[in-house]
């Protein structure tokens, strides 16, 4: 689950991590009032959406007086920002962060991620702050420094100091930088975050180390024990179909293609998307119905896929282990009848009760194309859609 920058900064502030003073605003008048209350000679007007690249898209402006705050707030609020992370549709700005300006001396990148290779949390840092870390990793990987954190003891002071020296934090500010990193790590662990990025971390003219931006992603599986984090969820920033999917315990991610996919198991779902691409098709979604799908769940999955008007065909690819193929066949038949399916449907079944499942599909009298293998199914649905 993602949260907004201003929410992330409030969490950091509660842990004693330095961030600029700021206030959230939902209207132009609120933005002006916030700037007035902050009383800074320079204010920063920042669009709040769940995506990076806001500055390049015109979503971050520096205002030197209240009139400029009003002008920029009017310009940004209601605007659709298109960045490299929003996709071509972009995201509409519905709230702003009004923040005190600061005298920036240097910019850095600090991030915490879960590293699958080491099964540990890794602290990453670079003196190339303010730019996309992916670009730094690709062009100058030697400028990224990492510390693998032992979960038994947590981030150690010597590790944070080593990072600070490696990215050339001024010696007189190393103590502040270490305190910052230790606080950030504590937030990461306490709140079950999966990503925490500060880009940029800055040093200022008056000798401070603070977060100028904050991005957090939290493990959705742990939200049951973090009611405070769950309250920060902004449903308007999420895909409506993904919200609906979560209500029915379906794992759904919308994509840009025209072939709907319904699969059981994340690995098989990814392989299904890959093989559709291999045969020159474009998957419209990732949809994992899980191991215990019922006929009702399959019906909801169909409705979800068909809610995407770009879908021109559906490929059902099921391996019946825990879930029997005849149960899936029953669900597919019921769903096809209920939604009045009018687009091509290809079904590939394998596993427990596969012959019974295939027999049920064949005798249903519905326009369902059977596939003998995953490759056969992918070829058939691509051919039918094209």
From Swiss-Prot:
Keywords linked to the UniProt accession: ATP-binding, Ligase, Magnesium, Metal-binding, Nucleotide-binding, Tricarboxylic acid cycle
Pfam families, alphabetized: ATP-grasp_2, Ligase_CoA
Gene3D superfamilies in the cross-refs: ATP-grasp fold, A domain, ATP-grasp fold, B domain, Succinyl-CoA synthetase domains
InterPro entries per the UniProt record, alphabetical: ATP-grasp, ATP-grasp_succ-CoA_synth-type, ATP_grasp_subdomain_1, SUCC_ACL_C, Succ_CoA_ligase-like_bsu, Succinyl-CoA_synth-like
Enzyme Commission code(s) on record: 6.2.1.5
Binding site for substrate: 264, 321-323
Gene Ontology biological process terms, A to Z: succinyl-CoA metabolic process; tricarboxylic acid cycle
Residues that, per the record, bind ATP: 46, 53-55, 99, 102, 107
A GO CC term assigned to this protein in UniProt: succinate-CoA ligase complex
Pathways involved: Carbohydrate metabolism; tricarboxylic acid cycle; succinate from succinyl-CoA (ligase route): step 1/1
Domain ATP-grasp: 9-244
PANTHER family: SUCCINATE--COA LIGASE [GDP-FORMING] SUBUNIT BETA, MITOCHONDRIAL (PTHR11815:SF10), SUCCINYL-COA SYNTHETASE BETA CHAIN (PTHR11815)
Subunit annotation: Heterotetramer of two alpha and two beta subunits.
Name by which UniProt lists this protein: Succinate--CoA ligase [ADP-forming] subunit beta
Organism: Shouchella clausii (strain KSM-K16) (Alkalihalobacillus clausii)
């Amino acid at each position: 689950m993602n949260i907004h920058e201003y929410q992330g900064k409030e969490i950091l502030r509660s842990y004693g991590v330095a961030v600029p003073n700021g206030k959230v605003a939902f209207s132009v008048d609120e933005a002006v009032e916030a700037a007035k209350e902050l009383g800074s000679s320079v204010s920063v007007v920042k669009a709040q959406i769940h995506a990076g690249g806001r500055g390049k898209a015109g979503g971050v402006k520096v205002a030197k007086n209240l009139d400029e705050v009003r002008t920029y707030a009017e310009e940004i609020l209601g605007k659709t920002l298109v960045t490299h992370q929003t996709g071509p549709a972009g995201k509409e700005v519905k709230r702003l962060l009004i923040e005190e300006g600061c005298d920036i001396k240097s910019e850095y990148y600090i991030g915490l991620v879960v590293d699958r290779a080491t099964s540990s949390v890794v602290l990453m840092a670079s003196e190339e702050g303010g730019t996309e870390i992916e670009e730094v990793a690709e062009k100058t990987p030697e400028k990224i420094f990492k510390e693998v954190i032992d979960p038994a003891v947590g981030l150690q002071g010597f590790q944070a100091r080593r990072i600070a020296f490696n990215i050339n934090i001024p010696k007189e500010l190393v103590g502040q930088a270490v305190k910052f990193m230790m606080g950030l790590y504590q937030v990461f662990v306490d709140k079950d975050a999966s990503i925490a990025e500060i880009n940029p971390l800055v040093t200022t003219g008056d000798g401070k180390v603070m977060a100028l931006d904050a991005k957090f992603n939290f493990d959705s599986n742990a939200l049951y024990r973090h009611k405070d984090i769950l309250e920060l969820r902004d449903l308007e920033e999420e895909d409506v179909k993904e919200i609906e999917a979560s209500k029915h315990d379906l794992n759904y991610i919308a994509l840009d293609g025209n072939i709907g996919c319904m699969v059981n198991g994340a690995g098989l779902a990814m392989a299904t998307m890959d093989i559709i691409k291999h045969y020159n098709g474009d998957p419209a979604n990732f949809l994992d119905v899980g191991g215990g799908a019922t006929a009702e769940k399959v019906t909801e999955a169909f409705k979800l896929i068909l809610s995407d008007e770009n879908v021109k065909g559906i490929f059902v690819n099921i391996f019946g282990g825990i879930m029997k193929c005849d149960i899936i066949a029953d669900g597919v038949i019921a769903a096809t009848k209920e939604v009045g399916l009018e687009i091509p449907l290809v079904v590939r079944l394998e596993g427990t009760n596969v012959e019974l499942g295939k027999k049920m599909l064949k005798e249903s009298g519905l326009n369902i194309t059977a596939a003998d293998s995953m490759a056969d199914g992918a070829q058939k649905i691509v051919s039918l859609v094209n």
